[in-house]
Amino acid sequence: MIFNTLSAAEMAALPKELQLDLLTEFHLLPEDLDHLDAERFGKVQRSGHTLYRYRAKEYRIYFEKHPQGVLVHRVLHKNTIRDFLFRSNLPMDADSEDAHLGETKEFWKLIDEGQKNR
């Protein structure tokens, strides 16, 4: 598992016990991405770029398949996403959250911010 600078900082800002809980819960290999539990995982897509979302406790972990494993872009509290959807005037239906996120430029700016800080 590879964290970019921004996602590493987001994890480091959490209490140590919560960090351990999230990392214990979020353990997967790139080949696991072919058989995901739809209740915990989602996909956010745009222009052929696929990010995956994992629901861990009150957090959302956004990541992608990487040649060296799994690259984590962001670790966000679920209310951060809800606030983002609210500010973007998007529906807050959990079932369509990923589809709506994939269509918004602001979400991809949030992800790109993490890539620039590697």
Segment roles from a protein language model:
Residues 1, 52, 70:
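A broad, low-specificity signal marking well-ordered, structured residues that form hydrophobic/aromatic
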Residues 1-26, 96-118:
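Arg/Lys-rich, positively charged N-terminal/basic patches that mediate binding to nucleic acids
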Residues 6, 28, 33-36, 68, ...:
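Short, functionally important structural connectors and interaction interfaces within domains
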Residues 16, 27-31, 77:
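Short, intrinsically disordered, mixed-charge
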Residues 28-55, 110:
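A short, surface-exposed loop/turn module that caps and links secondary-structure elements
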Residues 59-60, 64-118:
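Enriched for short, Lys/Arg-rich terminal
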